[in-house]
Amino acid sequence: MESEDERRGRFRYQPCLWLHPGIALCGFTLFLLNFVSCCCAATVTLLPVVDTTLIETEPTNNLGGALFVNAGVTQNFTKNHGLFRFDLAGQIPPHSQLTRADLILEVTHIPRDGYASAEFGLHRLLVSWGEGNKVADDPSHPGLGSPATTNEATWNDRFAFTTNHWSVPGAAPIYDYSPVVSARQTIYDVGSSPYTFESTPALVANVQSWLDNPQTNFGWLLKALSEVENFTSRRFGSREDTNHPPLLVIEFIPSLWIQQPEISGNQFRFQFAAQAGQSYRAEFRDSFSSNGWMTLTNIPAPATTTDALILDSLSSTKRFYRVVEP
């Protein structure tokens, strides 16, 4: 029996003219061998689209507009959780296979009265939240934020002044975020920055799921893995800090997916998303007992990603098509 992966990798198209339920007249059979993937991986580096801090000591405040995101435990044993979300739309071709994902963070400040090294972990968020745009009212206490307004994330709420609360203040494992640590890193001081949460199967799986199902992309929660010890709190550069922003570096293998195959008059047509800077060749053959694939058309590398339309006159009762990256 054909596996799901095999079905996804090969698309069989059989156009038929339906005259009556149960009666079909098929003049020809066409097969699309959906893609021949490039063996070379591509890399993209993304900035977060939203990030903020959940502040236990000021549970109704927001800090979404600050130059930093706080995470860890303060000297007074109060906790901070950092939230980050990256948007993959338009950055990675749909159906691409992700092979690596690294998150790079820079520590921009440590506790004034000393610090303890600590292991921090990334947890995949399971619910949505609002970034907000607040900074601290009191410049001498920049990590406390200021009172949230509607739809801004706080320690208590995913969206302030709505019914969308965290399951428990500060967010709860299982309900608000996955208890699984997707990646971890020991954090020391500013001088050891930047810190890379190196690729793991779980981290890659998080990002792959966001690519395949964008509606599940709520980002990551960053926290100290142990929230018993104090002096582990750190400020990490946020997206507003253009000198020290978080960076998500993704390595992937683009997949070429054929779209909208159809017959129009005496022509067979299909299209696919031609990636910027990549040339392609559409090929055909009428039989696998013949001498091989023949070139139908060459597609020059476009300057930007664009839909390429392939046309062929119907001159055979059976034909196979594929698109390759030379």
Model-derived features with residue positions:
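Acidic glycine-/aspartate-rich tracts in secreted/extracellular proteins
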Residues: 89-92, 108-111, 126-130, 224-229, ...
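Proprotein-processing/basic-patch segments
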Residues: 200, 204-254
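N-terminal secretory signal peptides that target proteins for export/translocation
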Residues: 1-19
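Bacterial N-terminal signal peptides
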Residues: 21-37
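Short, composition-biased motifs enriched in small/polar/acidic residues
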Residues: 253-326
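Residue-level detector of buried hydrophobic side-chain packing
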Residues: 86, 101-103, 122, 201, ...
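Flexible, small-residue-rich N-terminal segments that precede or flank a structured functional core
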Residues: 40-92, 110, 178, 226-227, ...
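Beta-strand-rich interaction/scaffold domains
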Residues: 47, 111-209
